[in-house]
Amino acid sequence: MAIQKVFARQIYDSRGNPTVEVDLTTETGIHRAIVPSGASTGIWEALEMRDGDKTKWGGKGVLKAVGNVNNIIAPAVVKANLDVTDQKAADEFLLKLDGTENKSKLGANAILGVSMAICRAGAAQKKLPLWKYIAENFGTKGPYVLPVPSFNVLNGGSHAGGDLAFQEFMILPTGAPSFSEAMRWGAETYHTLKSIAKKRYGSSAGNVGDEGGIAPDLQTPQEALDLIVEAINKAGYEGKIKIGLDVASSEFYVDGKYDLDIKAAKPKPENKLTYQQLTDLYVELSKKYPIVSIEDPFDQDDWSAWTHMKAETDFQIVGDDLTVTNVKRLRTAIDKKCANALLLKVNQIGSVTESLNAVRMSYEAGWGVMVSHRSGETADTFISHLTVGIGAGQLKSGAPCRSERLAKYNELLRIEEELGSEGVYAGAHAGKYIKAAKF
């Protein structure tokens, strides 16, 4: 089916920053996609094109990317008479049109918006739900897996104020019998956590960060973990909810060491750790708290640190800034035995096909996959369908708070309802591809 029209516009994300929205028209209607944006971004990510005009939106406008869609991509894809049901060919056309390795000519945010809209148009042409269309393209067979939600309930790092260097503290309801029950458990634990934090640290401790998690003024990861474990137990889910961390350690990697006091007014020299010391800290924390998954435990280019931790521990070790959903980086990480799970962010690489290629490579290597939102999000629910379509079994989309986060979780509730007996909840098998992980 031919593409009749492509039109992009600048809209706003959950942080009030500009982002790209694309409308793609075929005879089945208008198919819309909105591109997210990250705060802690890996240096190896595909180029997110911003205008750089400091007099408007602090330089974060995306009118150049919008212009590239409307003036370059749109006429080219209409003229090429692309088949929207051939995602691979459509994405290859877009990549060739850009012609650079990191999408610096047109912008990954321009290309991705069109790629996602084409995927939605393909699903409509095939008269399939988006998750089913992705599943058929990827080769996923039923029963279809509903993911364990990784709720980012407590924020630190670049997502919040306070001295806490670690960026995300997540709860994973692995013991729940269904996705809908996992949502209930997560919401109840989140509200319990917020109540405890406000009583202990004052009402401002209930204020939320970019991803909906609370952001109390804490000094150490132990303080954060103590709060979370107390909330889990008080909510009645002791032993049934696990903990995941996104350390985002590239953000506090300075001169070959990891500075846990990088945000502190009075930093202590003893809190500048080697990668061996930081590994020991993770192991020590896991003995006291039910931690099963650690994302970006080290800097994106500190390869030896990753290899060391993978050899010495049995965590799910998730590569985000390390791999940036890029098959070249991913292949290196696999060969070096750096991790055992990929964090999948479609805007890191900039097209649907390249994202699926990274998933396929991960599965073939025995890795798990956790699909992820970005801190600057929108109401777009593409990643909910992607998660089910590829059978990932894990999704992180922030806390059960803020509508741009709940949009993804609520869409999964609808998919669960639609699937009925064809759907299974990943639960304790979320890390099913990872033999060593402690799920």
From Swiss-Prot:
The modification Phosphoserine is found at residues 249-250, 351, 355, 421. SUPFAM superfamilies: Enolase C-terminal domain-like (SSF51604), Enolase N-terminal domain-like (SSF54826). Keywords: Cytoplasm, Glycolysis, Lyase, Magnesium, Metal-binding, Phosphoprotein. It is an enzyme of class 4 (lyase). Substrate binds at residues 159, 168, 295, 320, 372-375, 396. Its cofactor is Mg(2+). It is found in: Cytoplasm. Its EC number is 4.2.1.11. The modification Phosphotyrosine is found at residue 253. GO terms for biological process: canonical glycolysis; glycolytic process. It catalyses: (2R)-2-phosphoglycerate = phosphoenolpyruvate + H2O. Pathway: Carbohydrate degradation; glycolysis; pyruvate from D-glyceraldehyde 3-phosphate: step 4/5. GO terms for molecular function: magnesium ion binding; phosphopyruvate hydratase activity. The active site is at 211 (proton donor), 345 (proton acceptor). The modification Phosphothreonine is found at residues 85, 353. It comes from the Eukaryota. Mg(2+) binds at residues 246, 295, 320. Belongs to the enolase family. Homodimer. This is Enolase 1-1. The lineage of its organism: Eukaryota, Fungi, Dikarya, Ascomycota, Taphrinomycotina.
